[in-house]
Amino acid sequence: MCETCSIESNQAPQGMAYAPGKPFPAHHAQNASDYLNAALSAERWIATFEHETPEGIFWQQDASQPIDLSLYSGSAGVAYFYLKLTEVTGSAEFAEKARCGLSYAAAHWRDLLLPEQAAFQDNREGVPGVHLGAHMGVGGVGLVLIEGAKTFAESRDAEKYRRAAQAIGRFYTDESAQQGESGPYWTGSPALLMDGGIMLFLIALYETFGDQQLLEFIKAAGAQYLHWGAESPRGGIDFNGAGIETPFDWPNFAFGSAGSGYLLAHLFRITGDARYLEVARRCADFLDAVAVPQKRGKLLPHKLGGDDEFTVFYLGYCHGIAGTLRFPTLMGTLDNDTRWTTMVDQLADGAEALGAPEHMSAGLWNTVCYCCGHAGMAHTFLGLYCIDGSPRWREFATRCGDILLGSMKTHADGSASWPFAWERVHPEELSQRIGFYDGAAGIASTLLELFMLERDDYHWPRMIDDPFPEEPRR
């Protein structure tokens, strides 16, 4: 994701100016507390953007813009960070902030549908309809409310979060759905950022609270979703979230066939309908067909079509391996085929062949956030470590942690933030953000994971887009 606005722009700190092949600034943690202290310093900085209301708390950096409630870059994502702080530290103060943030989200999720708010989200990304989706829209708020209901299950607040999440579900089933040839849909884009993510939210809602009628709705939406897959002349089936009228195709997780395959795997898991498993396999065939060999392994290009086709390889969550690796990981739990572990190994090899995580490249520019950089990579490789205990995955995640610590900017008051380039095509423009996918909240959450890993008590409850075990294999 590369939006055009820049919040609190800064001159590049030493080591964070972009150059291909250049090493990122790094600092190796001496003990587990280094990770926790960095995360707590980030919390102090995020807290400076806190706004109290009678209905709860929201966080906002730029008062001239509409309040961003999204999971991706707004208040719901910051509330999710406070949930994680609560789970890791047990702090009553952080628990109260999480509750207040969730309460505000529960009361105001419909604000994302207001014309000014919807235009703000859609125009910022240049993708009409993202305000309806999961990451940047209503569904993402719902996912965080589900997590809040789980974390605070023994609290009276849990019922409030459950009711709000179910209201969001009814918004999707009763208000905003359109009728297609075989079932309901919303934006017409299969991307996980759009309709694919809405369906993941509905699956999470069904599995958390139970509702047979909702399951039948999901089945109908799944039948419609299959219509968006097209036989590719390259091989396999392609779900192009960029849109059928665009001259290019994004194959990776949040927009492309990797994300669609991931959703289809979940649809197979909850319905048992073998059509979904077969089409998910065909998505993998497409990804295999467009993968580009590296000195070691393979990588999927950021984009198919255009002058830079097959030349730029993102390594983060949205268009890169940190997201795409989730597809073969989930498939490996459902389909007894060695191709899935092979795919994981090849993509990891390809990333290291480009110099990751220590060195900058066209697809890992001077950025460290959860969406595009090291925070998202560390999270995914920690997840892989939870599956098989491979020292390789743990070491890769720790190396990413070195970059997160090394690129941190500490302020005079002891708080900390991360200046980095949001836009790949403008690496000279740095900003410091608070969001989960695009800023300090997500980076600090990954640091909490590394803290628990080093303390040998790793436990990470996961959202539905996150297929890894909650704890390492013992």
Go through the PLM ranges and name each one.
Residues 1-474:
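Glycan-recognition and catalytic cores of secretory/periplasmic carbohydrate-active enzymes
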